């Protein structure tokens, strides 16, 4: 049995990075991520309701919204599956954070604060499957000179990070190694090197969870595992459908179309069935409707009708 929480779950991710009482963890991670660029000394968590809400994202995307002492904003996300318009969605989120800084009247001089989007991706991004870290800025197409530093995207493809413990050379790499392998540890590495990992070990120890938090975590891990099972089933169904179509239209063309269609159908049908099943079980156990909606991604109307 795992000793430490799974950071790819909603409860796990937010326990590590989303608690004001333990905000030093997120501060340390951001400083290691942006080492050599800036030094953050404090953050304030913002109301996540300020972010655009898409009910279908719940259950597979978990986000945290905060600002630092200089007023710069950070959106930190964990995403467990790729979406068709993943890049557009990221651009929309950050653009909304920029737009909300506007003030009415002639006195405002467009003195914008930078907005950073940090996206943990627990999957291979289809258009750049082999690159772990991708940094996106607004720059001149010909000279590569930065046009503006007010919008920054950092994509982290976790499956592409393959370093072992003794191969990690920076504190940022140590963070990623710990997050990616957390469930397999009986003790966290790097504690002697950096005190934040000592603090992290205390926070992520499952034995330290209260009874209520443990119940929420157990449901969160169930939703996460069901999601993985749905994806595996969808991929298999897509492969079989693709091969059947390939017999008629050619193996290569048929597999491509069949897999895409099968995966989409499998995701939609399988995920909804799992969400309803999880919500029904949580409702029976007396969970608050808002907690059920947050974990499963269902609307309150759908939950009340169960």
Language-model segment annotations:
Residues 1-306:
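Elongated, amphipathic alpha-helical interaction scaffolds
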